[in-house]
């Protein structure tokens, strides 16, 4: 019996089969899955203390993404076999989830309350607070796992960069989860865009056909109605019983019918240089009233000034800029200018009739049905207004500019498609002879308001109307054009127009002329703040003086309680009327730069900064700028300058690139020169073509001598830029420091103190740009403070402190 028991104990155990082992594993996995699912369900529903605590423990790991995490884990527990069959599905979900953790944590640490906290400690503190209090209230981002991922990413790419990195993770995860790759997505997007474009085009064609059907139906109904009215009219006519004829003038009826059948001939408007048109301003009466309000008599702003809280004006207001009044000053008259000779452009009419036929035949040869409705003969170009037939695309006509120039044997053709405010297309063709528009002729026809001191007659439009603009509305003007295009003549015309209307105590000029020949004639007139600046190095300092004056004026306005120069001068007038102690009104200031490109080569940073500040703030202070350049490239007219000088005047340029730099569109490359311009004011979407006025050097000298005979120049020392030397620091082509940097000693002391030398250290410690830091390194090497560069090795410091 004992032996049998021993034999029974020593018998080997039966080995389980593979199927039995797999079954046991499946049972264990099922039990664990069910237990895990129950745990997750308790956590998701937050049932009792156990559920809240479990949920907070999961939040400690993945933060506020606990619900998506638990939901994904439940799917994995019961569908893991199916998920394993999908290539990349699990990896894609994990990578996308990590991206979401980074996004959630970046959002958490973008909150103001988390900006200065440590990433790990701040996250743990938020979660622990809820965990101990048995609650779920705080937003905890991506939990500790999110903090672990976010910290290095934020260190390398900042908080904003973390959003992009997280988005890339999510995008990569989506690509892994789906069978698509980047090429499939791009192909899908391209096909979708193509389908939308085709559908849009088909819908557009259907709408066009429907409109045409409605139009034809309306025409048919109109013809039927006209036929019925004609039958009714014939039925009511009186018939002579003897002759059987209708008692009506049949001859006139026949001639009327023939006139109806004959094609209407285009209207041709000849250019008359002495025709005085009432429409003499580029702006309507409302705009002129606004300009009058801003700069003229200041009547409309008196109510605004009186509505402000009255301030104590007994104390004298200190004004740095106090020009003298000129009580006996007389304004120049137009008689100073030589009368212009009448222009004979009679032969242009015959040429226009011929060109109308050529235009229609040329369009017909290209299969385009058009009709010339009107032709306006201007001083330099003739504008043909054509009406295309229904269904003709505008760009088909615009693309024929070169073909039209060939057919008309013209120098160039400019197409305005369409004309603003009209359902017509304008074709501008140069005249065989250009009629010069004199300054006197333009002044006599402009009817400019004498109270608007900065309203300037600019030129004549294609229809011969004199056009003017108010610099106070612009409020700054950019003038650009190649040599010989009429840019300097236009600037002289603007200056002369202001001198014709303003006394020295009303308007002051600061003129900058690096070429030294364009504006020097205005030296010693009483309107100048300082003599004409010809040194480019002084120009930047002079512009800075104007910036300082602008700031002083704003401080003065703030102290008085007014918003602009008009309100201040109104307050001064009211104070002077009621007090024996007189205050001096502030004059307007016009800054004129004749060649901006030369200034930008010498001191680009200082000049650009001053121009930008004046462009942004100077209008209310009564300061306006006119910037002229013959090289309209992007390195001269930067984007910031263009943004702050909204009004543009473009003369003939050499390329379409220059035209786009000035006007943001083509057109200036097709101008003829000699005063032919495109003017685009601040409140116009499209430029207006004008023929600028011509003012000779003799005319300028006469008006300058007339002014000099009445008053002497009274320069203001507050605007004097002082003397500058050739080695003056701070002036170089790129706006950095020139040779002999004033920070050399400070950089040397820094290197000797730290016994380290690198451009990045100097850039960081001295707050300078990289270019200036490298130049300081070169100067330190030349002075023997540091050794030469040795590849990637740090430089040796050769001196000690």
From Swiss-Prot:
Region of interest: Disordered: 720-739
Subunit-level organization: Homohexamer. Forms a ring that surrounds DNA.
GO molecular function (one): ATP hydrolysis activity
Keywords: ATP-binding, Cell cycle, Cell division, Cell membrane, Chromosome partition, DNA-binding, Membrane, Nucleotide-binding, Transmembrane, Transmembrane helix
Protein topology in the membrane: Multi-pass membrane protein
Domain commentary: Consists of an N-terminal domain, which is sufficient for the localization to the septal ring and is required for cell division, followed by a linker domain, and a C-terminal domain, which forms the translocation motor involved in chromosome segregation. The C-terminal domain can be further subdivided into alpha, beta and gamma subdomains. The alpha and beta subdomains form the DNA pump, and the gamma subdomain is a regulatory subdomain.
InterPro entries named in the record: AAA+_ATPase (IPR003593), FtsK/SpoIIIE/SftA (IPR050206), FtsK_alpha (IPR041027), FtsK_dom (IPR002543), Ftsk_gamma (IPR018541), P-loop_NTPase (IPR027417), WH-like_DNA-bd_sf (IPR036388), WH_DNA-bd_sf (IPR036390)
UniProt keyword Acetylation present: no
Entry superkingdom: Bacteria
A Gene Ontology term for the protein's cellular component: plasma membrane
Gene Ontology process terms (BP): cell division; chromosome segregation
One Pfam family from the record: FtsK_SpoIIIE
Gene designation: ftsK
Domain FtsK: 464-660
Transmembrane intervals: 31-53, 58-80, 89-111, 131-150, 155-177
Functional note: Essential cell division protein that coordinates cell division and chromosome segregation. The N-terminus is involved in assembly of the cell-division machinery. The C-terminus functions as a DNA motor that moves dsDNA in an ATP-dependent manner towards the difSL recombination site, which is located within the replication terminus region. Required for activation of the XerS recombinase, allowing activation of chromosome unlinking by recombination.
Family of the protein in this entry: Belongs to the FtsK/SpoIIIE/SftA family.
Listed name of the protein: DNA translocase FtsK
Cytoplasmic side of membrane: 178-801
Residues reported to bind ATP: 484-489
Location of this chain's protein in the cell: Cell membrane
């Amino acid at each position: 019996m004992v032996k049998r028991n021993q034999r029974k104990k020593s018998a080997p155990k039966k080995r389980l089969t593979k199927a039995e082992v797999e079954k046991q594993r499946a049972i264990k996995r099922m039990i664990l899955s069910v237990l895990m699912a129950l745990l997750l369900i308790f956590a998701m529903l937050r049932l009792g203390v156990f559920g809240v605590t479990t949920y907070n423990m999961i939040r400690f790991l993945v933060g506020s993404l606990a619900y998506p995490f638990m939901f994904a884990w439940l799917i994995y527990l019961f569908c893991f076999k199916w998920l394993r069959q999908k290539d990349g599905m699990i990896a894609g979900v994990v990578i996308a989830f990590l991206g979401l953790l980074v996004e959630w944590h970046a959002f958490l640490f973008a909150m103001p309350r988390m900006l200065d906290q440590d990433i790990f400690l701040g996250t743990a503190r938020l979660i622990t607070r809820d965990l101990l209090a048995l609650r779920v209230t705080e937003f905890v981002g991506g939990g500790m796992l999110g903090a672990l991922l976010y910290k290095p990413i934020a260190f390398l790419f900042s908080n904003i960069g973390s959003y992009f990195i997280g988005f890339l993770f999510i995008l990569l995860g989506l690509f892994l989860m789906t069978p698509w790759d980047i090429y499939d997505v791009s192909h899908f997007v391209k096909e979708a865009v193509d389908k939308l474009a085709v559908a849009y085009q088909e819908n557009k064609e259907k709408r066009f056909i429907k409109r045409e059907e409605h139009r034809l139906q309306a025409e048919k109904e109109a013809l039927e109605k006209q036929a019925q009215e004609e039958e009714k009219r014939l039925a009511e006519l009186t018939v002579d019983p003897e002759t059987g004829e209708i008692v009506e003038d049949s001859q006139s009826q026949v001639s009327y019918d023939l006139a109806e059948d004959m094609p209407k001939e285009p209207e041709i408007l000849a250019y008359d240089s002495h025709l005085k048109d009432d429409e003499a301003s580029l702006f309507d009466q409302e705009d002129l009233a606004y300009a009058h309000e801003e700069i003229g008599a200041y009547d409309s702003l008196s109510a605004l000034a009186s509505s402000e809280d009255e301030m104590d004006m007994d104390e004298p207001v200190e004004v740095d800029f106090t020009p003298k009044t000129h009580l006996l000053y007389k304004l120049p008259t137009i008689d100073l200018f030589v009368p212009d000779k009448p222009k004979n452009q009679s032969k242009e009419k015959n040429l226009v009739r011929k060109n109308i036929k050529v235009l229609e035949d040329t369009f017909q040869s290209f299969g385009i049905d058009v009709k010339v409705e009107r032709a306006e003969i201007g001083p330099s170009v003739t504008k043909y207004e054509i009406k295309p037939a229904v269904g003709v695309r505008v760009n088909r006509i615009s693309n024929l500019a070169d073909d039209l120039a060939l057919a008309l044997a013209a120098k160039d053709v400019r197409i305005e498609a369409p004309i603003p405010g009209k359902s017509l297309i304008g074709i501008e063709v140069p005249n065989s002879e250009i009629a010069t528009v004199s300054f006197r002729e333009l002044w006599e026809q402009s009817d400019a308001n004498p109270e608007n001191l900065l309203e300037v007659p600019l030129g004549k439009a294609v229809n011969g109307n004199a056009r003017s603009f108010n610099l106070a509305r612009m409020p700054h003007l950019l003038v650009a054009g190649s040599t010989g295009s009429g840019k300097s003549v236009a600037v002289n015309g603007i200056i002369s127009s202001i001198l014709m209307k303003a006394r020295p105590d009303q308007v002051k000029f600061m003129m900058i002329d690096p070429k030294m020949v364009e504006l020097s004639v205005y030296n010693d007139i009483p309107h100048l703040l300082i003599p004409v600046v010809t040194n480019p190095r002084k120009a930047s300092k002079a512009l800075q003086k104007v910036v300082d004056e602008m700031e002083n004026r704003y401080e003065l306005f703030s102290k008085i309680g007014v918003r602009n120069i008009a309100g201040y001068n109104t307050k001064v007038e009211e104070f002077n009327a009621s007090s024996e102690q007189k205050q001096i009104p502030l004059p307007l200031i016009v800054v004129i730069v004749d060649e901006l490109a030369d200034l930008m080569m010498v001191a680009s940073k200082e000049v650009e900064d001053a121009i930008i500040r004046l462009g942004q703030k100077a209008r209310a202070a009564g300061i306006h700028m006119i910037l002229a350049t013959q090289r309209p490239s992007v390195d001269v007219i930067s984007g910031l300058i263009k943004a702050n000088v909204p009004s543009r005047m473009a003369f003939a340029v050499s390329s379409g690139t220059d035209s786009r730099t000035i006007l943001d569109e083509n057109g200036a490359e097709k101008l003829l020169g000699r005063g032919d311009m495109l003017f685009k004011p601040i409140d116009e979407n499209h430029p207006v073509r004008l023929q600028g006025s011509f003012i000779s050097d003799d005319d300028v000298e006469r008006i300058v001598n007339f002014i000099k005979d009445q008053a002497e120049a009274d320069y203001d020392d507050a605007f004097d830029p002082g003397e500058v030397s050739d080695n003056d620091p701070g002036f170089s082509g790129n706006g950095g420091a020139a040779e002999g940097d004033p920070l050399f000693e400070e950089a040397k002391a820094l290197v000797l103190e730290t016994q380290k030398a690198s451009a990045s250290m100097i850039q960081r410690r001295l707050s300078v740009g990289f270019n200036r830091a490298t130049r300081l390194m070169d100067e330190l090497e030349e002075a023997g403070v540091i050794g030469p560069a040795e590849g990637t090795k740090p430089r040796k410091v050769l001196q000690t402190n």
